[in-house]
Amino acid sequence: MNVLIVGYGVVGKNLHKELEVLKPDIYDIKFKEFDTRKEHYDFAFICVDTPYTQEDPCDCRQVQKAIRENNADIYVIKSTMLPGTANMLQAITGKHIVVSPEYYGGTQHCNNFDFNFTILGGDKEDCLKVQQLRSEEPHV
């Protein structure tokens, strides 16, 4: 299973801890010199900034760039987005996109997989694949 995490801020670091047994690759533009990305991934988790600007209450250009620059079967967007953005991105890129928002934002660490539920939005088949990703981890 090849997994990529794009963005290594609070959200990306937390996700890395949660998926550590899958040995995900990490890419962050701040650390270009450590770029070891593969040509293709099963899953790419997008954890980039979507800042508020006067022109756009949720600037998703970095999300679009992350999707364009990485090749994956399914892109899981952890970044904050406005409703309808994932559908728009899917229409523009033709990629399989699942939205799985964070519960804690840019605050202290919180293990999302310890919750009794996970929010997934997108095509049902793609969402099931993301859900199954967790069951493929060896349980300690």
Model-derived features: where do they sit?
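NAD(P)+-binding Rossmann beta1-loop-alpha1 motif at the extreme N-terminus of oxidoreductases
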Residues: M1-H40
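Small/polar loops that bind or transfer phosphate-bearing groups
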Residues: G7, I77-K78
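Surface-exposed, flexible loop/turn segments at secondary-structure boundaries
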Residues: V11, K32, Y52, P83, ...
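Short, well-ordered alpha-helices that flank and scaffold nucleotide-derived cofactor binding pockets
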Residues: K17-V21, R68, N87, A91
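Short, well-ordered alpha-helix to beta-strand connector turns
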Residues: K23, H40-D42, A72-D73, T93-G94, ...
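Rossmann-like NAD(P)-binding element
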Residues: D35-I74
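Rossmann-fold dinucleotide-binding core
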Residues: V48, M81-V140
